[in-house]
């Protein structure tokens, strides 16, 4: 599995023979100026909620690549109305796609679409096939619902957790989240993009290490091979 960090909460993941794009937000992110979204080959987009910093490039990329977006019902309807192929899910549901199974799980956050319309409930995704499994938390606070993931999904290879604080949980709560989901390899997201969510990398990584966890704080454009 190849994982490429495209900034903020956006990742390109090669999984199950398909190219997945998580929360597309590139053109509007000045930190990701080295990423050309027109170079991305995408089969599916997984969109956790409707905020612009998670869905900002979904229309452009969806129109160019004909990728299928996977999102909650309200976001799916909004995308379809703009000519994007999309599949609707909701919290607690799962579906087997041609790259693996996707389960939509709880996130504690807010959600409104860029035009001000209702974005429905925010969520996260657990994705798995016969050999690997990962959790995309989306924007969320620490929530006891995370304890359900090890009970209902395969053991996680890694998890993508927000840890910039202010708008999501900070790294201290992300450590607790990693314990509740029984995952030892965490890839951080939703940090350093804007001034309020800048973090101390050294302190965060040391805190994870003290908890017996590995934290990767990727640089934009970095590729991780698992």
Over which residues does each language-model region extend?
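Glycine/small-residue-rich loop that forms an oxyanion/phosphate-binding "nest" at active or ligand-binding sites
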Residues: 56-113
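Short active-site oxyanion
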Residues: 1-2, 63-68, 132-134
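Zn-dependent metallo-beta-lactamase
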Residues: 1-19, 26-29, 96-103, 109, ...
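Active-site-proximal loop/helix segments of hydrolase catalytic cores
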Residues: 113-123, 128-179
């Amino acid at each position: 599995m190849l994982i490429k960090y495209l900034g903020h909460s956006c990742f390109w993941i090669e999984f199950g023979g398909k190219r997945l794009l998580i929360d597309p937000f590139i053109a509007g992110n000045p930190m990701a100026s080295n990423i050309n979204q027109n170079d991305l080959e995408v089969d599916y987009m997984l969109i956790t909620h409707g905020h612009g910093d998670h869905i900002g490039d979904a229309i452009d990329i969806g129109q160019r690549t004909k990728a299928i977006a996977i999102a909650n019902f309200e976001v799916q309807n909004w995308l379809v109305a703009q000519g994007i192929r999309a599949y609707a899910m909701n919290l607690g549901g799962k579906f087997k796609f041609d790259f693996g199974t996707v389960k939509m799980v709880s996130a504690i956050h807010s959600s409104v679409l860029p035009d001000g319309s209702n974005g429905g409930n925010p969520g996260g995704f657990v994705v798995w096939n016969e050999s690997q499994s990962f959790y995309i938390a989306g924007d969320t606070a620490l929530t006891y619902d995370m304890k359900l993931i090890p009970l209902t999904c395969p053991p996680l290879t890694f998890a993508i957790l927000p840890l910039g604080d202010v708008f999501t949980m900070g790294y201290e709560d992300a450590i607790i989240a990693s314990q509740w989901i029984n995952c030892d390899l965490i890839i951080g997201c939703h940090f350093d993009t804007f001034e309020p969510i800048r973090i101390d990398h050294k302190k965060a990584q040391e805190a994870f290490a003290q908890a017996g966890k590995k934290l990767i704080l990727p640089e934009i454009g970095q590729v991780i091979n698992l």
